[in-house]
Amino acid sequence: MQAKYKRVLVKISGEALAADKHTGFDFAFVSRVCEAVKACADEGVQIGIVIGGGNFWRGVKDGAGKVERVSADRMGMLATAMNCLAVCDVFRQLGADARILTAMDIQGVGERFDARKAIEYLERGSIVLFACGSGHPFFSTDTAAVLRAAEIQADAILLAKNIDGVYSDDPRKNPDAVRFDEISYDEVLARHLAVMDTTATSLAMDNNIPVIVFALAEPENIGKVLEGEKLGTIVQ
C-alpha cells in the first residue's frame, strides 16, 4: 500500500456497527471493518478511531424529554465505551494490538486519555480507540473525533458514514441532489450541509484537517481512501 496519509482518525457511527440489525452489533460486519482497518495498520498507517454510541443510545432523541441533556449525553458516552470494548476485542482476536483511551475514568475499560500516550501507542503500531467522546456533555462524537484528530496531529479524518459523500441535499428525499467531489469548510457551514455538526466542522477548519466523507457499506473503502483513491467527498 502506498498510503497518502501516515496518521488518520477514523470516525465510525454506532449505527454502522449494528448494520441492518439497527441496534447492538452485527459482528460479521464489525469483523469486516476491523479486518480492513488492521490491513491498513499492518502497512504502517497509524490509526485512531472514534466510535459513536447510536446503536445503544441516541442522547436527547432517546431521552424523549424524560432525561436531562447532561444525563442523556453521559449515557451516550457510556455507549461509546461499550462499543470500544467490543471492537477492541474483535481487533485482538484478529491479532492486532488495540488500546482504549477514555475521556472519563472508567476502571477496567481503558486508560485515561492523554495525547502524548496516544501518539506513543500509535507510533508503536497500536490501533487506538478513543472512548467517551470528549468527556463533556453538549458535544457530539463528531466534535470529539475532530478534537482527538487535532490532539494526535492526524493528517486527515476519515468520516465513515451510511452515505457515499456530501450532497447538495438529502439524496434519499431529493433525486436531483448532487454529490460533491470536493467542498470547502466555509461552503459546508454556509449551506448547512449534513456532514458534521457546525462545532466539529469549525474545529476541523480552524486546525486545517481535511475530512474525507465516504460510505462504510464496503469496509474496504477505508484502504482505498488511504491510498488516495477518489471516493466520496473531501472537505478542506
What kind of feature is each model-predicted range?
Residues M1-Q236:
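C-terminal catalytic "cap/lid" subdomain
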